Amino acid sequence: MKKIISTGKGQISRVTGNRRLRSKLFLLLIVTCGSASFARAQGGNLIDISGQVVDQQNKQALAGVSVSIKGSIAGTVTDDAGNFKLRTKFKFPLTLVFTSIGFQPQEFEVKSIESKLYIALLTQTNLGKEVVVTASRVPESRLRSPVAIEKLDIRAIRESAAPSFYDALENVKGVQMTTSSLTFKVPNTRGFNIPNNFRFMQLVDGVDMQAATLGVPLGNAIGPTELDIASVEITPGAASALYGMNAINGMANLLTKSPFTYQGLSFYHKTGVNHVDGIDDAPSILTETAIRYAKAFNNRFAFKINIGYMQGTDWRSNTRLDQNTNNLKSANPGFPALNGANNVAFDGWNKYGDDALAGSNVVSLSGLTINGNPNQTLRVARTGYWETDLVSPRVSNLKFDAALHYRISEKAELSYSYRIGNMSGVFQRGNKVRLDNVVIQNHHIELKGNNFVISGYVSIENTGDSYNVKPLADNMDLYSGGATDTKKPDSWGTKYKNALLEYATKNGGGLTDANLAAATQYAREQADASRVKPGTPEFNQLKNTIIKINNWDIKSSSIPDAPETGGAALVQKSRLYHTEAQWDLSSKVKIFDLLIGGDARVYEIIPDGNNFVDFSRPIDDRNKPEADGSFGANIYYKKFGSFAQVTKTFFDEKLKLFGSLRWDYNPEFKPKYTPRLAAVYTFKENHNFRFTYQQGYRFPALFEALSYVNNGRVKRVGSLPYINEGLGYLENSYTQQSVINFNAAVSAQGNTDEAALANRNLLVVADLPDAGPEKIVSYEVGYKAVLLNNRLVIDIDAYSNQYNGFLGQVQVFVPKGVSVGTDAAVLAMLDRNRDATTATSTTAASQGQDRYRVFTNAKNTYHNFGSALAITYNLYKKFTVAGNINFNEMKANKTEDIFVTGFNTPRWSTNLSFGNREIVKNIGFNVTWRWQDSFLWESPLVTGGVAAYSTLDGQVTFHLPKLKSAVKLGASDIFNHRYIQYAGGPTIGGLYYVAVTVDGLLK
């Protein structure tokens, strides 16, 4: 039954159904006779509807209230006086929808013309009742979403104690943030965290923000500014069923402000200071500025422009721990005199060129007599350089975006948007990369109706002046200090060995435990004599030369065509073409809701001859330029997909069932089908129980699939099987760990050929499979409730994931010219046979070995599980306390795999916040305490423990309504408790800032 209120010549009614009760609780509609506002018929069947919206509590006009017509894209916003005017071709009855931050969204049915509307909205807390679109690709209540989903709206972003909306993601239930740089932060959910997170998708208004060859979004480098962000929706866990192959760990969708709804000129400026303790750098100023302007004309055409610039001094990665301690087989466990600070195989967390653990910068000094024992061998690492000497701490991000919107009709809107960002910072995958003048561009065109979306975009990537830190350190050492081996009289290894023997002769006549530490220290000093020293003009000149050369090899007898100094430049250029469409057929099917969609994506890589090559060219020519200067034909990597989702409610809408099926095809692999089944049951309106089953797949990212780069004489190769042709690393190689164990055993037995053949059983054949997509099977249960008269929200979920074919990297050793298992292959695995050797009186000749780091699938199945609980409670008036606690665990496997997967997630983490958006008139505050447990971080670059830490963030905001301004005074990590978020990552401390926002000028 509808409740009709007489309004003179017209009528207006409340929409019936379940909204009726909520209307009484959260919204008061007062319709009075007057002359200020009206609806009237126009020529050409146009209707003008106008009115005023005020706050019922204080009768003040409400500016910025969104007023739209249900079932269309037509809408407007109220002006500073709360007035609105809307022209439409719709016929009566029609439904108006009013939404505003802090007020319950509500629908009203206008039944006839000439109604005079005066609307007063009742301020109410809206805990837990947000509308989200990401979980099912259609608007729905967050309480009844089929999967876990979190949302930060404008109010939550403004009130957050974090210094930016992007930093605020770290306080969301289930989210773990990894900070590689001030300009580069990477969110993740539900385990297997890495700084280059291929498993977590980030969208801006539905557009994938990834830099294609790097494989991940560069933080918020081309994302929204603080002025243009409207909301953020985060889906922890698999979202592949509707969004495709990259979202098996989760996704974030950053939604920006419509120029129709949010008009005028806005300004934002933040000034902060970090490094206040002066440990890693002098106290440094950070600034961020943004400007936004948006304007709509006749509610038909609108545009917006955003520009933002941020600059500061980065957090420094300078942890001087050793990850290759002397008790490991990759060091010298037989010589305890070399323990601790005396470790000659030192491999520092943030040092490069000393990569003893990976075996790429190690010389094997054989034939030594130590403690009177002949034929002893020492493994000695090159000295290398610290990251702080190789990477500038200055970072910046300049970004611009603009959008044009045109409402073709009341049911269709066409828009074009352009984004560009230039950023510098630090990125980590297998090694650290200094990003410098990286430019990402995005062109997006979209046609959107009330039941369909057609979208297409192209993203353009150029890594600019970036460089890889490891080849920089390697080549600086090799060029100025000499080759690593001991085969040449002027090599670093020969100089080290000669100095070692010289010291022994002058100090007792031999090497013993008593003088071994001093002897190796002296030998390093002598071998390093010609090496360029940080801070000198020679160092800077050599560095500047190397980082501009896009060839990471260095000239040698085996690579005569390589540059004299070697190079380290990261030159990657690509384009990503994407188109997609979805159509809501619910109004046509009637018996259930049906959503269908499809997409196509093409990556285009311009080969640079170093990171990406044209595989149609002969192996020996792939790194050489052609006559026109190019490195061959462009490389294409494609994916196509489609999906269908059915939704049906039962039992008076208490039970809601979801079923979806997605099909994805990449020409390099077999097609994959991704199902999702979910059920949501609502009990007594406020209690919602959820169960979800889904599968997901992930095709290898571009670098995982197609890379072909020599880095420290270890070639990184993609997972596609045809790359193996002529190289043999899949079927003719030994695992790295088995080679380390083999060499340790042989060294302990005199480092002879006989000892090598006697220990051949220690070598393990890698036997790598043809790589395929990664698969996840996920189960999830959840409960959401709004209790105590809308003052308490409880949100709890639990999940269980099973990964098959987990993608990662394994390093393998290929014996040149011979087959694994033969005597020649065994001898080729000796450290002294890294390169081809000739026969001596005691050793056989060897063709040497090649080393590859291969992207491939794990052989084990991995099972991780966890749970998260979030509670929000409105204590008293506007005081709110909120918190979440998160548990994540991975089940241990009984057998070791060919590579370490790296769960890289704390078992326990928690956030607790307390605040009041208006403790006194126009002043609000919020404080957030965050803690996470210690955990083990494992990666190809650094493996080590990450200590537990806690931080306290806080902010006080002063609102100046007459000036349309707000001043936010805040700090993250108030007490400057220094911490790291991952092994090898930067040390983070306190950031103290003041931010000024001026909003809504020149409307």
Report each predicted region and the residues it spans.
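Conserved C-terminal beta-signal and adjacent last beta-strands/turns
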Residues: 22, 294-300, 306-312, 395, ...
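Extracytoplasmic beta-strand/coil segments of soluble accessory domains associated
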Residues: 87, 141, 149, 166-211, ...
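N-terminal periplasmic accessory domains that precede
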Residues: 116-120, 165-168, 185-191, 200-203, ...
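Periplasmic-side early beta-strands and strand-to-turn transitions of outer-membrane beta-barrels
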Residues: 268-436
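Gram-negative outer-membrane beta-barrel transporters
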Residues: 649-651, 794-936, 997-1002
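Membrane-embedded beta-barrel scaffold of Gram-negative outer-membrane proteins
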Residues: 722-851
